[in-house]
């Protein structure tokens, strides 16, 4: 059947499927899974007649999606909690490091006294983060960092106090201050439930975790999952009359592994749970489960089973999706991040438009670099302000807010040294401001980063940014005027408001932290331009891979791409992305282009098929079949967007724990020899 459907897709023009925005009423019934896509670890709240949900997206950014619904069935992504939350080698895919399968996990979403809170822990940093905002759909968010990792933490606000419930098997509680910004000194800190798994069995693949604590009608409920050996995952509930217990527990759902999550009520008093099920390569997909009550215990499902067809809890709202097509026409609006510096990674050895500041010598070098293959060496310094600068006159505005970052390294001199990232507004040195500083360790790359607001009365007739060491009227050559290296410098615009500022449709996420210098929706109007900023051995190490979820039971993604800007050794195209990925791409070898299908299902990327390409515009298609966990992907290309040809072999998709994520459609461009090549994506269309 799929082959016949696939052939129709290859010979018929693609019908553009977009997210409905008109007043189209949803059906009175729906079928589970409620979202046939990767949405694990969900947490749902209701505020008035609106439901909000968060989920785990780990190494994808922006991170922790905020999804919105009026009926618990039709969901759309309206915001993210952060653009990025850390700036390390693993987050940036540098020096062979990554955070696949780690990143942000199992967020907790709460609303208390007019403020929205999101808490999550990170396996990458070993810390727990709490974000809060007064407007969950636009932000801005403020962040508090807890120095400890609290596994699968769940927030609770109770009688003016704040808590986190967390852990595996032995479920613990720690008290926060009333603002939920730090652990409260001397506050409650104890185990709530010992051996919480025991109500589900004696041997386990995964012991009880995924805590969700809620106070309902004066009682405290802790919802957990466990995975007994020889069984599927089960939903557990513990109940107590007081916060510290004692708690009694039971298994409340044992059905096909559907588990993990709390419960939420409707305005009319009905109750539901959004729980997920491991479902092969498409990922961990959510089911909407009815919940009733018996003797103050929640009863999940109907006769112990999750219904496959149900009435929509609240009727009359339009259909929504968390995936969609994109013509890339929205990038000229406000709010998109723009990198204001050129040649920020110094891969162009001419260094233009960088120049020396005061008396110094600057040169590109490959002897030291943080990202890509080159950095900039500053030497022969005569003053502490001597360094490297770039003029940005006309690019900034009075009152404008900008983020900045630079990697700096020095190898001679004192054990530690402070470096400044500075700006000069106007022709006089009196307009100099130190935007940010960092104390670096000799022999190690360090980061100077922060946010800078241009003064409302700044003289913008001349503006430049530069890197320096702190001022000294009598600088010591060894301790103040040492040579230093600079790499990956950024000075970016920010959104005027909002939690995130990518300028992209909300269904898109980058694989790891994006490099804002090397993607653009404005360099060519109506196109997404991806430029290579580092040399990468494979797709898994490449930055600025743009992804969105595949979905079941079948989904097809199509791109139109223009390739005139590619360089020798570049690969660019469309992938079915996970650890065992496959793609169809253009490959440039010397001056010869070819269309290549690659398959990495064995763990190693193999080029399976190749055909010559003698034009700049090309169309690619990836077709995914998740029916009954068939988990196969097929690849095709077209030279005119109408007539399609299959290429290569079938990718047997597999859900792997190193990535711990369902397959995604991925637009990519990566360099294997030299940087600076670019491609322009005209559209991505999904059905």
Question: Can you say where each PLM-predicted feature lies in the sequence?
Answer:
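Bacterial N-terminal signal peptides that target proteins for export
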Residues: 1-9
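Hydrophobic alpha-helical segments, especially transmembrane helices
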Residues: 4-5, 375, 550, 665
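Short non-domain terminal segments
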Residues: 7, 28, 155, 326, ...
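Hydrophobic helical h-region of N-terminal Sec-dependent signal peptides
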Residues: 10-15
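Sec-dependent signal peptide cleavage junction
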Residues: 16-29
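Carbohydrate-active catalytic/glycan-binding domains of CAZyme proteins
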Residues: 26-338, 444-447, 458, 490, ...
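Extracellular and organelle-lumenal recognition/adhesion modules and their flexible linkers in secreted
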Residues: 336-500
């Amino acid at each position: 059947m799929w082959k016949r459907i696939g052939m129709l897709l290859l010979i018929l023009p693609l019908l553009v499927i977009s997210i409905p925005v008109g007043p189209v009423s949803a059906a009175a019934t729906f079928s589970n899974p409620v979202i046939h896509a990767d949405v694990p670890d969900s947490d749902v709240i209701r505020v008035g007649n609106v439901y909000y949900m968060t989920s785990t997206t780990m190494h994808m950014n922006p991170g922790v999606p905020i999804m919105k619904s009026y009926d618990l069935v039709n969901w759309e992504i309206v915001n993210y909690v952060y653009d990025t939350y850390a700036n390390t080698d693993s987050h940036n895919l540098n020096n062979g490091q990554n955070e696949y399968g780690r990143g942000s996990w199992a967020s907790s979403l709460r609303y208390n006294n007019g403020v929205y809170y999101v808490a999550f822990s990170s396996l990458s940093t070993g810390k727990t983060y709490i974000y809060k905002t007064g407007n969950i759909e636009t932000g801005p968010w403020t962040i508090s960092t807890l120095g400890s990792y609290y596994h699968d933490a769940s927030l609770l606000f109770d009688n003016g106090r704040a808590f986190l419930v967390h852990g595996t098997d032995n479920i613990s509680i720690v008290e926060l201050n009333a603002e939920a910004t730090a652990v409260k000194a001397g506050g409650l800190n104890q185990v709530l439930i010992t051996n919480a798994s025991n109500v589900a069995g004696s041997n386990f693949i995964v012991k009880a975790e995924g805590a969700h604590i809620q106070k309902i009608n004066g009682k405290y409920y802790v919802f957990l999952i466990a995975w007994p050996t020889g069984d599927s995952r089960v939903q557990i509930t513990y109940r107590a009359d007081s916060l510290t217990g004692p708690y009694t527990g039971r298994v409340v759902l044992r059905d096909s592994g559907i588990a993990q999550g709390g419960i939420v009520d409707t305005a009319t008093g009905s109750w539901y749970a959004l729980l997920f099920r491991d479902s092969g390569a498409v990922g961990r997909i959510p089911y909407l489960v009815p919940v009733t009550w018996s003797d103050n215990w929640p009863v999940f499902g109907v006769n112990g089973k999750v219904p496959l067809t149900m009435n929509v809890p609240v009727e009359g709202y339009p259909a929504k999706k968390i995936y969609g097509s994109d013509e890339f026409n929205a990038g000229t609006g406000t709010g998109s991040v723009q990198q204001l510096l050129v040649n920020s990674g110094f891969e162009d050895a001419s260094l233009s438009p960088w120049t020396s500041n005061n008396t110094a010598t600057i040169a590109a070098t490959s002897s030291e670099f943080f990202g890509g293959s080159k950095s900039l060496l500053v030497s022969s310094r005569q003053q502490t302000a001597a360094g490297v600068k770039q003029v940005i006159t006309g690019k900034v505005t009075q009152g404008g807010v900008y983020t900045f970052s630079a990697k700096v390294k020095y190898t001679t001199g004192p054990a530690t040294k402070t470096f400044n990232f500075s700006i000069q507004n106007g022709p006089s040195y009196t307009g100099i401001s130190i935007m940010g500083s960092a104390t670096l360790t000799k022999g190690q790359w360090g980061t100077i980063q922060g946010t800078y607001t241009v003064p409302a009365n700044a003289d913008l007739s001349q503006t430049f940014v530069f890197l320096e060491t702190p001022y000294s009227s009598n600088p010591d050559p060894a301790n103040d005027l040492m040579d230093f290296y600079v790499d990956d410098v950024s000075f970016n615009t920010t959104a005027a408001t909002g939690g995130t500022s990518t300028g992209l449709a909300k269904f898109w996420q980058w694989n790891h932290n994006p490099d804002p210098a090397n993607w653009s929706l404005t360099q060519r109007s109506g196109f997404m331009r991806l430029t290579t900023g580092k040399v990468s051995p494979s797709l898994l190490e490449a930055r600025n891979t743009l992804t969105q979820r595949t979905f079941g039971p079948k989904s097809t993604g199509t791109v139109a791409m223009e390739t005139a800007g590619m360089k020798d050794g570049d690969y660019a195209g469309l992938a079915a992305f996970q650890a065992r990925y496959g793609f169809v791409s253009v490959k440039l070898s010397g001056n010869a282009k070819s269309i290549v299908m690659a398959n990495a299902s064995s763990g190693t990327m193999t080029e399976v098929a190749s055909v010559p390409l003698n034009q700049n515009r090309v169309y690619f298609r990836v077709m995914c079949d998740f029916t009954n966990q068939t988990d196969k992907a097929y690849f095709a290309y077209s030279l005119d967007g109408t007539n399609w040809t299959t290429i290569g072999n079938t990718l047997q998709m597999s859900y792997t724990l190193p990535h711990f994520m369902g397959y995604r459609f991925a637009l990519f461009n990566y360099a294997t020899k030299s940087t600076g090549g670019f491609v322009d994506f005209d559209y991505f269309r999904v059905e």
